[in-house]
From Swiss-Prot:
Family classification: Belongs to the RAPGEF2 family.
Species per Swiss-Prot/TrEMBL record: Bos taurus
List of residues binding a nucleoside 3',5'-cyclic phosphate: 135-252
UniProt biased composition (Polar residues): 1244-1254, 1304-1328
Ranges for domain Ras-GEF: 717-944
Subcellular compartments: Cytoplasm; Cytoplasm, Perinuclear region; Cell membrane; Late endosome
Compositionally biased region (Low complexity): 1105-1122, 1138-1159
UniProt protein name: Rap guanine nucleotide exchange factor 2
Record remark: domains: The Ras-associating domain is necessary for the Rap guanine nucleotide exchange activity. The N-terminal regionis necessary for cAMP-binding. The PDZ domain is necessary for its targeting to the cell membrane.
Length: 1486
């Protein structure tokens, strides 16, 4: 890192962007723009270090929904169903919603400790947090660890505080953890450093001096500082720790010496980088205790630097011939097969490699290893479906079969004709046939199997490679030939042995093997099989698997969590108890990060129910298991119906009714199984007498069946919908191969083309639009409300299933603009569901890199199965990839690959569960009160009960205590849900959804007619009509039409924070950072102590500060500014913004929003004393008009300044800057938790917070009003209309207001060139503070302590200072809002306000700037003709430009003194100012 003393390159900021993300990374969703903005991670989880641009999209925050006074509504008009009765609601205790979803901010606790008091765990916490920041990029883990051990924490509380003066001696190297600072150079250039950037000394003891003046730009800037001496020592020590391996004078590998703790027991060398050949060779070298996962990491990531896996395969075969390397080579191959069997399947060269390796093992008499290899192949092989056709039934089969249930085996292929179609289809020796034409072949006699295969000309065959069992079968057959007697298998009925218990290691293998029972009485044989397998494992384990190097790592994790210097546990304990002799720290054969078990073999316990009818329409409920055949059902049905005939006279028939009303009837084959899964809703099973031709189902019954098959969402159980969603999502999630993440991340071509990953990726969009489609297609308002309520319940149950993906999708769907604008529908939602919804949203608060969600995900009691939020996974991986170079000094950067592999392993563990997926998410009829806090795992879920016992739970036959009819009804509900989900018709076009939304609730007029008119305002052209506070009086004022070339103008919006300061010692009384100050480095230490003391006294003072600093979100969110090289693209029209008397601002950015553009409002606290303020209303052609509207009289104004405002969350950077805020009313009890509180914010955008962006657009957060408020505190005494005002998106236009006229002149400033340093490609960075610097003699009325300070009104023009004119003391500032289409009028409502959704990170939108200004964007539509006509009548009269006034810097008043009230305490009119005087004031907006 270069020091600040060198102006050309300041820390990381000097690095130019290398490459922006490929657009297809963000295919998940459409938002308003493509932003190549750099986002930096600030959570304690994601593990990324970023130095280049990422394209993950912005996401509006999930704000807090407020309650309205309207209580629960009367639902009597809507018939209640059993699913959604109010009684049910009372049973389901929703009061748990008050349980907050917060935990202590562990990272801050660690930072505030004295460095000498930090434990190893503290350093691990800090390391995981810090190593994602760009300042630490390309540092080795040991250097980061050392820096974390000595860093001190400092907080500068006030914006505008001088941190370093020009020429001051530097004494430390510092990294910004929160907030941003601005460096103003003597030549007038300015640069903004944001979260993750560094400044200060270089790693040398030479004296260095600050160049320029550094000031904080926002309140509550947080830094960590490392003293110069420590910084120099640590960085210079790196070379000493490096060990370079040279060959022929060239460096081929670099290792680093690491100590993982202070005990000195865990230390050694770890590979940092190397050539591909040398890394391959390292596979069979000795690995130190600090690098135990090298083989795994290599086998996952070799594809990024090697062209073909055979490069590794050939080397392994070659090394196998060396007896000293043989065991190591075998272990590598076993791990490869176990972890990435997909590298072998479908690749002929790799299949031949595997066969050759097997032959080598046989040749060397390594039988135990060979068995383990076969076990691994059987465990990892996937089912394959192939179709064969025979020319005639008599035609011979092209293959020979062995096995059969009479021998205790399945059906296996012994040989295949080489020239047959079966070979072309992929059938090969050793394949086990699992199913033919829907009939189960896993437990069938060989003769019966041959009969089925011969009697069909069209064969649909499901097979799976199972070499281990096939070889066991061959051994048995040879023994039989020798001994002359059939040999009963020792490995018996595994299904009955261990299905409902957590098996030990041997039984795991047993389940994998899939051996079948000989007959129904062979349960006792299991023990012999288990013992035999244990012997197999015992023989081979020691020679293959290394001994456990240390004992303090949990079973559920690989050693890599500790090795690379990250935390030792990811808090995902595994449910697999491992036998004591197996190294639990190695992800070896039976502990893959993905599933090991094959769940195709299910229990024989009768846990399913069929309803079987007779021709006279009597019915009985029959308990069956999944493998019960049709013939067995007939036997049971005859017994239930008390029929005296023999089973041979009857058969099972399926009768179904098509949607057209056609009745179909077919006889089921005797061997057909999975009967409960096959029956349709519009079908029934009948017991049919084979000798009669009676009609089984009459027309009346058929019509009834057809009616029953028509399903609506409200008829479905919310628990069952959540369960089925979770089962479906989990199946998709666990099918993702680890290699797919790598292929997708590095854009590698693979034979599977990441199909599983893409499928799972699409789910979140489909579920989001499902929610919107379902709600908007319902025309009845009461039913619409009930559907919303239904979805909130489903989301809650998804949380219980740990299905965060669906939970997030449902919340996002409810917040899509077309749904969010349905004000009257939302008003009818009961308050308790408001609170529930708010609680669910709170989990996905994007601040601090989604700290709340990550805390829940990593909590101790959250165990697999977990379905994580996929966009966050993808973002984390992308940042690791984009933020670290793949090659360093010509060598493969293996440190980067190790971090990526560790992240993928962590994700994979969420899917590693040793349980049938069908049982995982079963939480039938669980009361909500038992769900616990949202921040806790559901310890009463079935899988967790089993997992936590670590042993065998007592099995209970469910049929002994569960009513068959009740079971059937539950199963029928599951069938209904499955059919409903499979037949969904989604409306994925947001324009169509908007049309449906307007049909549900048409847009209303934008302007109320009088002050008492409380009619909610909606924009006819806005897709979002937010629910906000009451609509105050608005007086239209004329505005001249804007010329077409002015369409790219933005709003000038001042920003003010409602966040309470941590005032203890006035920061300005403290000396600057550097040596020149009396206290030198002590200054920052005193800041640190001040912040620390503050925390202990804070709870008594204010709740916001308490919640924010001690809980999961830090005091301020990561805010940042874009890199050099970007400019703002022009946008079409100007958004309006308006402030309401007691409304709070929230950005309303929908997930998909080519039509959902909103406007940028001023944010004010909830108070009733009002004063005039400015509202600018957009028009269709960017002609605006000013409204005068009674607004709150605050001590501080809050401003909708895009990213700076913590709540102004819809900020999009770079290509197009789109802000979509809106207003919401705060209820009194929520005032203290107001979202402008910086603690939980940083919500400029999803990525700015979720990824800790340091390139997020941010300018002013938590400024004092004088620093940020050019209007709202600038007044003139003109009783007439105020003129409109606009500013360009890059620079301020000159806007001047004379004393008694509404005339104005504006002059557009030309943009600075891209290569100018001060123009950091964004309006956020090329600005200073307009309000504070331009306030000279401008005729503004300044208030201090309630007194008006009048200046000369004649000179009341405010001139913008361009960046060229800006000086360190007078830096021009503005906040330009590049609006979207003419679609964003702020609307208001009485009562509650629903917040918009988070747009998931990684979603890209249609970039508006892809189209020239002259042509309309295809995704935008003009306002309705009537609206345009109405607005055209509001055009202003022409104005003459007055003489420009000069802008001079003015002293910056200290608005908040220690005696001032809390900024959140609500605005009050200054003493002595009456309400009448208030009303008479005119506000000039500049």
């Amino acid at each position: 890192m270069k020091p600040l003393a060198i102006p050309a390159n300041h820390g990381v900021m000097g690095q130019q962007e290398k490459h922006s993300l490929p657009a297809d990374f963000t295919k998940l969703h459409l938002t308003d723009s493509l932003h190549p903005q750099v986002t930096h991670v600030s959570s304690s989880h994601s593990g990324c270090s970023i130095t280049s641009d990422s394209g993950s999209s912005s996401l509006s925050d999930i704000y807090q929904a407020t309650e309205s006074e309207a209580g629960d509504m009367d639902l009597s008009g809507l018939p209640e169903t059993a699913v959604d009765s109010e009684d049910d609601d009372d049973e389901e205790d929703i009061e748990r919603a008050s349980d907050p979803l917060m935990s202590r901010d562990i990272v801050r606790d660690c930072l505030e400790k004295d460095p000498i008091d930090r434990t190893d765990d503290d350093i691990e916490q800090l390391l995981e947090f810090m190593h994602q920041l760009p300042a630490f990029a390309n540092m080795t883990m040991s250097v980061r660890r050392e820096l974390c051990a000595v860093m001190v924490f400092a907080v500068v509380e006030r914006a505008g505080t001088i941190v370093l003066n020009d020429g001051e001696e530097l004494d430390s190297w510092s990294v910004i953890l929160n907030g941003s600072v601005e460096v103003t150079y003597p030549d007038g250039k300015a640069e903004i450093l944001c979260m993750g950037n560094s400044f200060g000394v270089s790693p040398t003891m030479d004296k260095e001096y600050m160049k320029g003046v550094m000031r904080t730009k926002v309140d509550d800037c947080q830094f960590v500082c490392i003293a110069q001496q420590d910084y120099c020592r640590i960085l210079n020590q790196v070379e000493k720790n490096m060990q370079k391996v040279e060959e022929e004078g060239e460096i081929v590998m670099v290792k680093e010496h690491r100590e993982l703790d202070r005990t000195g027991t865990r230390k050694g060398h770890i590979v940092i980088k190397g050539t591909s050949e040398r890394l391959t060779m390292h596979l069979v070298e000795e690995h130190s205790v600090v690098d135990p996962t090298f083989i795994e990491d290599f086998l996952l990531t070799y594809r990024t630097f090697l062209c073909s896996p055979m490069e590794v395969g050939k080397k392994l075969l070659e090394w196998f011939n060396d007896p000293s390397l043989r065991d190591k080579v075998t272990r590598v191959v076993l791990l490869w097969v176990n972890n990435h069997f997909n590298d072998f399947e479908g690749d002929p060269a790799m299949t031949r490699f595997l066969e050759e390796f097997e032959n080598n093992l046989e040749r060397e008499k390594m039988g135990g290893h060979l068995r383990l290899l076969n076990i691994a192949c059987a465990a990892k092989a996937k089912r394959r479906l192939m179709t064969l056709t025979k020319p005639a039934r008599e035609a011979p089969l092209p293959f020979i079969l062995l096995g059969g249930s009479e021998k205790g085996f399945g059906i296996f292929v012994d040989s295949v004709d080489s020239a047959s179609k079966a070979t072309e289809a992929g059938l090969k020796r050793g394949d086990q046939i699992l199913e033919v034409n829907g009939q189960n072949f896993e437990n069938i006699q060989l003769s019966k199997a041959m009969e089925i295969l011969r009697n069909n000309t069209h064969l649909s065959i499901t097979v799976k490679t199972n070499l281990f069992v096939f070889k066991e079968l061959l051994t048995r057959l040879s023994e039989e030939k020798r001994n002359g007697a059939p040999h009963l298998p020792k490995i018996g009925d595994i299904k009955k042995a261990s299905r409902y218990s957590i098996p030990d290691l041997a039984v795991d293998v047993e389940q994998v093997i899939g051996l079948e029972k000989v007959n129904k009485k062979s349960k006792a044989n299991t023990v012999g099989g288990r013992n035999k397998l244990k012997k197999i494992l015992d023989k081979t384990r020691i020679s293959i698997l290394p001994q456990k190097p240390y004992n303090d790592i949990g079973i559920g994790q690989s050693q890599d969590d500790s090795i690379v210097g990250l935390r030792q546990t990811k808090h995902i304990p595994t449910a697999l108890p491992v036998s004591g002799t197996l190294s639990s720290s190695n992800p070896d054969l039976l502990q893959s990060h993905h599933r090991i078990l094959d769940f195709s073999a299910t229990p024989d316990l009768p846990d399913q129910v069929l309803r079987v009818f007779k021709a006279d329409q009597q019915s009985r409920y029959i308990m069956i298991s999944k493998d019960t055949t049709a013939k067995e059902v007939v036997v049971q049905a005859i017994r239930e119906f008390a029929v005296t005939a023999t089973p041979d006279q009857y058969s099972l028939c399926e009768v179904s009714v098509t949607p057209e009303g056609v009745i179909k009837q077919r006889r089921l084959p005797d061997q057909l199984s999975k009967l409960a899964d096959r029956i349709q809703l519009s079908g029934r099973y009948y017991l049919k007498n084979n000798m009669e031709t009676e009609t089984l189902c009459s027309d009346e019954d058929a019509q009834e069946l057809l009616r029953e098959s028509q399903i609506s969402l409200l008829q479905l159980s919310t628990v069952e919908v959540a369960t089925q969603l979770s089962m479906r999502n989990f199946e998709l999630f666990r099918n993702i191969e680890p290699t797919e993440y790598i292929d997708d991340l590095f854009k590698l071509k693979s034979k599977t083309s990441c199909a599983n990953l893409k499928t799972f990726e699409e789910v979140i969009n489909q579920e989001t639009f499902w929610v919107a489609s379902e709600i908007l297609r319902e025309t009845n308002q009461l039913k619409r409300m009930k559907i919303i309520k239904h979805f909130i319940k489903i989301a809650l149950h998804c949380r219980e299933c740990k299905n965060f993906n669906s939970m997030f999708a449902i919340i996002s769907g409810l917040n899509l603009a077309p749904v969010a604008r349905l004000r009257t529908t939302w008003e009818k939602l009961p308050n308790k569901y408001e609170k529930l919804f708010q609680d669910l949203q709170d989990l996905f608060d994007p601040s601090r890199n989604m700290a709340k969600y990550r805390n829940v995900l990593n909590s101790q009691n959250l165990q697999p199965p977990i379905i994580p939020l996929f966009p966050v996974i993808k973002k984390d991986l992308t940042f690791l990839h984009e933020g670290n170079d793949s090659k360093v000094d010509g060598l493969v950067n293996f440190e980067k690959l190790r971090m990526i592999a560790k992240e993928i392993r962590h994700v994979g563990r969420m899917a590693s569960v040793n349980m049938d997926p069908a049982l995982m998410f079963r939480t039938r009829k669980k009361k909500w009160r038992s769900l616990g806090s949202l921040s806790q795992g559901s310890t009463n879920a079935t899988v967790l009960d089993v997992a936590q016992t670590g042993g065998h739970k007592k099995r209970v036959r469910r049929s002994s205590f569960l009513n068959a009819k009740k079971l059937y009804e539950d199963a029928q509900m599951a069938r209904k849900v499955k059919q409903y989900l499979s037949n969904l018709e989604l409306e994925m076009d947001e324009e169509s959804l908007q049309t449906l939304s307007l049909q549900c609730e048409p847009a209303t007029n934008t302007l109320p007619k009088n002050p008492t008119d409380k009619k909610p305002v909606k924009s006819e052209t806005s897709p979002v009509a937010p629910r906000a506070g009451l609509q105050p009086k608005a007086q239209p004022q004329p505005q001249p039409p804007q010329p077409p070339h002015k369409l790219n103008q933005g709003l000038q919006v001042p920003a003010v924070s409602l966040y309470p300061s941590r005032k203890k010692v006035p920061v300005k009384d403290l000396p600057p950072f550097g040596i020149n100050s009396p206290q030198a480095l002590k200054k920052i230490l005193s800041l640190s102590e001040e912040g620390s003391l503050e925390r202990h006294r804070r709870p008594a003072e204010d709740t916001i500060s308490n919640t924010s600093s001690q809980l999961s979100s830090p005091p301020t969110s990561p805010q940042s500014s874009p890199r050099k090289g970007y400019t703002l693209a022009p946008s079409g029209t100007v958004d309006n913004f308006s402030d309401s008397g007691h409304s709070e601002i929230s950005s309303r950015s929908s997930i998909v929003s080519n039509s959902s553009f909103d406007s940028l409002p001023v944010s004010l606290p909830d108070e009733r004393r009002q004063r005039p303020s400015v509202s600018i209303v957009e028009t269709s052609l960017a002609s605006g008009r000013l409204e005068r509207r009674p607004a709150v009289e605050p001590d501080q104004y809050s401003l909708g300044s895009c990213a700076p405002l913590s709540e102004s969350r819809g900020l999009y950077a770079a290509a197009t800057v789109i802000s979509s805020p809106s207003t919401e009313e705060l209820s009194q009890d929520q005032g203290d938790r107001a979202s402008l509180d910086a603690a939980d914010s940083g919500r400029g955008s999803w990525t700015s917070c979720s990824s800790g962006s340091h390139d997020n657009i941010q300018t002013i957060q938590h400024q004092r009003s004088w620093e940020t408020l050019p209007f709202g505190h600038t007044h003139f005494d003109y009783p007439g209309d105020a003129a409109g005002l606009w500013a360009s998106s890059s620079h301020m236009d000159q806007i001047m207001f004379p004393d008694h006229s509404a005339k104005y002149s504006r002059q557009s400033q030309s943009r600075e060139s891209l290569d100018q340093a001060q123009s950091r490609a964004s309006w956020a960075s090329s600005t200073g503070y307009w309000g504070e610097d331009s306030e000279g003699d401008t005729g503004t009325i300044k208030r201090r302590g309630g007194k008006d300070v009048s200046l000369d009104a004649d000179s009341s023009s405010m001139t913008a200072v361009t960046a060229e004119e800006a000086k360190p003391a007078a830096m021009a500032a503005h906040i330009a809002v590049t609006p979207s289409a003419a679609k964003g009028l702020i609307a208001r409502k009485e009562g509650r306000y629903r917040e918009p959704p988070p747009t998931p990170p990684g979603y890209v939108g249609i970039p508006i700037t892809d189209f020239p200004e002259a042509h309309p964007h295809p995704a935008r539509k003009p306002p309705d003709y009537t609206v345009a006509l109405q607005r055209s009548r509001m055009l202003a009269r022409p104005a003459e430009p007055p003489a420009p006034g000069s802008a001079r810097p003015a002293p910056r008043p200290q608005w908040h003194r220690p005696g001032d009230g809390d900024p959140r305490a609500g605005p009050c009119a200054p003493p002595g100012l009456t309400a009448e005087e208030d009303e008479d004031e005119q506000v000039s907006a500049v």
